[in-house]
Amino acid sequence: MKVIAINKKARFDYSLIDEFEAGIVLLGTEVKALKYHSASLNEAFVAFRRFELWLNNMHVPPYKPASRFNHVPTRSRKLLVHKRQLNKISGAVRTKGLTLVPLSIYVNENGLIKVKFALAKGKKKHDKRQDIKDRDWARKQARQDFS
């Protein structure tokens, strides 16, 4: 598994409930640009549209050798999931306060580009502060164990 892009802020801003994997519908120039490890998930989000999952605002920069036949960098891209998973996800998203957040894009062992996304609930500011305190405390304990 070769990771192309990671959404680092997702784990900090949201508490993740359940993770899913999906295929993604891409154009040829997008595939080539992604294979060069150039993508950004910082502003990306997953949304439902007509009983389908769509990945919005993922930035894939233009593939330089393609010149005028390039893609639109932030276009919406369809995610491919099984119908059973789609029903489970749609039921969960209807719950107040839950959203779908993309976590990473990677190439699996078969050479297919996949998106890992999660069902998540937004954290409040005090939750984020508590996470930072817990992380610092764990680091301090790990240092003391080595001493």
UniProtKB/Swiss-Prot annotation:
Region (Disordered): 124-147
Cysteine pairs bridged by disulfides in the record: none
GO cellular component: cytosol
Biological processes, Gene Ontology terms: trans-translation
Location in the cell: Cytoplasm
Bias (Basic and acidic residues): 128-147
Keyword presence, Cytoplasm: yes
Stated family: Belongs to the SmpB family.
Protein known as: SsrA-binding protein
